[in-house]
């Protein structure tokens, strides 16, 4: 059995295992898969729908199931999330600079999963807001979309009621330098349908009045929605306190969204 077929067999065996199966075994399998994917990254991208999507789906099952299950983000969730992120971030590094729309969508979806788990690990109270959210959007400063300019980021808005994904772009002054680090991620939670739909269909520009939930004061309290939105920014070293998103703009990525229908 060649390496490609072996990976596919492993992926499918993981995909049919319970989401909360023996984590040690899942972690070991994910580690092995990650190492093999690293060696065959070119082959991965040659057949995204047949290989990369299946291999990542098996690893990401825990993450998606975890953040879509209502309830408190516990110490156990944090510990498991940290281990999951090690495997997820390794896979995500292979997805930089996608060449096709399919590759870009898979990369952005994967990025969004990692951002949510990272956020809940940093601030568990955000999980309670997420449980109440009608929808959410996640953005990243790295190159996970096609033909992005220096100050642009890529992201996806997800309707939690229907599961529909709308791919989007973001412009912000802090994106070029990753706000002092290699990258940063932004998570926006929407309290209701009206606010979410307006963001997706009309785009949005952040004003100076818009605050980031994770400030010095609110980080110690139970987070609340502000004007129907809750906004968090996360860097490679954790939650960015008092981050200023004033002037940031968001709009639909028609190329990725329309070709996904």
From Swiss-Prot:
Biotech applications: The antidiabetes effect of BefA was evaluated using type 1 diabetes mellitus (T1DM) and type 2 diabetes mellitus (T2DM) mice models. BefA protein significantly reduces blood glucose levels, maintains the body weight, improves the glucose tolerance and exerts a protective effect on islet beta cell morphology in a T1DM mice model. It also downregulates the expression of TLR-4, p-NFkappaB/NFkappaB and Bax/Bcl-2, and the secretion levels of the pro-inflammatory cytokines IL-1beta, IL-6 and TNF-alpha.
Main subcellular localisation = secreted
Top-level division of the source organism's lineage = Bacteria
Leader peptide range in chain numbering: 1-21
> In which compartments does the protein localize?
Secreted; Host
Q: List the disulfide bonds.
A: none
Record key words, sorted:
Secreted, Signal
Q: Does the keyword Secreted apply?
A: yes
One Gene Ontology cellular component term attached to this UniProt record is: extracellular region
Q: Where are the transmembrane segments?
A: none
SYLF domain: annotated span: 99-261
What remark does the entry add? Membrane permeabilization by microbiome-derived and host defense proteins is necessary and sufficient for beta cell expansion during pancreas development, potentially connecting microbiome composition with diabetes risk.
So what does this one do? Answer: Stimulates the proliferation of insulin-producing beta cells during development in gnotobiotic zebrafish and mice. BefA is a microbiome-derived protein that traffics from the host intestinal lumen to the pancreas to act directly on pancreatic islets. In pancreas, interacts directly with host beta cells and elicits their proliferation via a mechanism of increasing membrane permeabilization. Can also permeabilize bacterial cell membranes, but does not show killing of target bacteria.
| Annotated domain remarks | Contains a lipid-binding SYLF domain which is essential for activity.
Name assigned to this protein: Beta cell expansion factor A
- Native species: Aeromonas veronii
């Amino acid at each position: 059995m060649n390496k490609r077929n072996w990976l596919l067999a492993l992926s499918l065996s993981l995909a049919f295992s319970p989401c909360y199966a023996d984590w040690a075994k899942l972690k070991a399998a994910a580690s092995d898969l990650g190492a093999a994917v690293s060696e065959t990254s070119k082959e991965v991208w040659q057949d995204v729908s047949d290989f990369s999507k299946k291999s990542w789906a098996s690893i990401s099952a825990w993450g998606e199931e975890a953040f879509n299950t209502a309830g408190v983000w516990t110490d156990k969730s944090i510990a498991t999330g940290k281990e999951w992120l090690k495997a997820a971030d390794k896979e995500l590094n292979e997805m930089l600079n996608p060449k096709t729309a399919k590759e870009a969508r898979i990369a952005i979806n994967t990025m969004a999963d990692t951002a949510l788990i990272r956020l809940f690990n940093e601030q568990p109270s955000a999980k309670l807001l997420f449980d109440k959210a009608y929808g959410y959007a996640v953005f990243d400063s790295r190159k996970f979309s096609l033909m992005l300019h220096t100050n642009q980021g890529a992201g996806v808005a997800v309707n939690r009621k229907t599961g529909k994904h709308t791919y989007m772009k973001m412009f912000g002054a802090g994106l070029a330098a990753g706000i002092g680090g290699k990258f940063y991620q932004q998570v926006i939670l929407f309290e209701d349908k009206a606010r979410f739909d307006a963001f997706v269909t009309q785009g949005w520009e952040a004003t100076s009045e818009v605050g980031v939930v994770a400030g010095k004061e609110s980080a110690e309290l139970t987070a609340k929605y502000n004007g129907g939105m809750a906004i968090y920014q996360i860097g490679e070293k954790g939650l960015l306190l008092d981050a200023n998103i004033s002037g940031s703009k968001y709009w639909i990525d028609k190329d990725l969204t329309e070709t996904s229908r």
